């Protein structure tokens, strides 16, 4: 059994109400519950954290070596395009991670076209709405089954 950590960045607490034409109507607690259920069915544990504060996400990443986290799934939200600190934290703990986005940043404003995480991620899943999370989790489960 592996422990998986799911991190959500700024404004994702507003899912279901914020720009539903882009992000959909499903709420973050609904996403977390569905992913935790799927991880459990695959024999793994999953915990999640959402924060609008960069330092909270970084501190949680820093705690992963001591808590047995095997894999990180992260939707960094707007921190994707701005946070060298988040990138450095992920590199410091040296755990595999997948970057997730509900929308496809490359079809949006030009400032969203750059990710500070993508070149270090095992993979990036974007543009499939809520299914982006499910696809990412299935990829992680498959990797864990093959002894990353």
Curated annotation (Swiss-Prot):
Highest rank taxon of the organism: Bacteria
EC number(s) given by UniProt: 4.2.1.10
Keywords (A to Z) from UniProt: Amino-acid biosynthesis, Aromatic amino acid biosynthesis, Lyase
Gene3D superfamilies: Dehydroquinase, class II (3.40.50.9100)
PROSITE patterns for this protein: DEHYDROQUINASE_II
Site residues by UniProt (Transition state stabilizer): 18
Pathway connected to this protein: Metabolic intermediate biosynthesis; chorismate biosynthesis; chorismate from D-erythrose 4-phosphate and phosphoenolpyruvate: step 3/7
GO molecular function: 3-dehydroquinate dehydratase activity
GO biological process: amino acid biosynthetic process; aromatic amino acid family biosynthetic process; chorismate biosynthetic process; quinate catabolic process
Listed HAMAP family: AroQ
NCBIfam families: aroQ, PRK05395.1-1, PRK05395.1-2, PRK05395.1-3, PRK05395.1-4
Function recorded in the entry: Catalyzes a trans-dehydration via an enolate intermediate.
Name this polypeptide is given: 3-dehydroquinate dehydratase
Organism per entry: Xylella fastidiosa (strain 9a5c)
Name of the coding gene: aroQ
